[in-house]
Amino acid sequence: MTGENTGDNPRRVLLKLSGEAFGGGKVGIDTTVVRRIAEEIVPAVKQGVQVAIVVGGGNFFRGAELQQAGIDRSRGDYMGMLGTVMNCLALQDFLEQEGQATRVQTAITMGQVAEPYIPLKAIRHLEKGRVVIFGAGAGMPYFSTDTVSIQRSLEIHCDEVLMGKNGVDGVYTADPRKDENAKRFATLSYNRALVDNLAVMDAAALSMARDNKQRIRVFGLEGAGNVTQALLGEEIGTMVSTAESTLAE
């Protein structure tokens, strides 16, 4: 499948990557992992897919966890936002090493390393074949990068959000690491995900997606080529939408 939609408009997606993915399960950046992700993004862009990315910062800081250690929640969230920018710059570097023009836009102004977040400018970059990476979350505390991924996708008119997960290849009826009888959903309704508290994203982000009918595909990051397949629109993982829930065969 190519990056072209059925109409005249090219496919435009937002890829959500967790900070934990960048760290390979450790604090800091696992360059091998980030390089592989970059290498899998480029083929999809070359086939015409317009790719925006939101990156988390959990491999450096998490505001909620810092709060438990006695740090003010707002300040901890800002520390997490700065962590996302470090991840953005790392991914930008590896993408550019692959010859892919990339721009970083941040919700907190830091002109020496990134552009400010301007939706129309981001759209223009995408139309020119550049990858756009959004950093610093929403620029405000108490907003998760899951929520930011939905908000940004709506503002720049993405067809769907792609949630890359570690350790699972989609959304299951139960935690597959704890329940051997857990089944993967092929399709999942927003309401079922919310009512059953299934591991898609946080409730605020999922509610925003439901209210605006923004499709979400949840897939596993570990499999070779999975990022490329998801970007191209292949049916891997679990699609969360208004459709009825069905289990994978």
UniProtKB/Swiss-Prot annotation:
It catalyses: UMP + ATP = UDP + ADP. GO terms for cellular component: cytoplasm. It comes from the Bacteria. It is found in: Cytoplasm. It is an enzyme of class 2 (transferase). GO terms for biological process: 'de novo' CTP biosynthetic process; UDP biosynthetic process. It comes from Bifidobacterium adolescentis (strain ATCC 15703 / DSM 20083 / NCTC 11814 / E194a). InterPro entries: AceGlu_kinase-like_sf (IPR036393), Asp/Glu/Uridylate_kinase (IPR001048), Uridylate_kinase (IPR011817), Uridylate_kinase_bac (IPR015963). Transmembrane segments: none annotated. SUPFAM superfamilies: Carbamate kinase-like. Belongs to the UMP kinase family. This is Uridylate kinase. It holds the Pfam family AA_kinase. GO terms for molecular function: ATP binding; UMP kinase activity. ATP binds at residues 16-19, 58, 62, 166, 172, 175. Pathway: Pyrimidine metabolism; CTP biosynthesis via de novo pathway; UDP from UMP (UMPK route): step 1/1. Catalyzes the reversible phosphorylation of UMP to UDP. Homohexamer. Keywords: ATP-binding, Cytoplasm, Kinase, Nucleotide-binding, Pyrimidine biosynthesis, Transferase. UMP binds at residues 57, 77, 138-145. Inhibited by UTP. Its EC number is 2.7.4.22. Its main location: cytoplasm. The gene is pyrH.
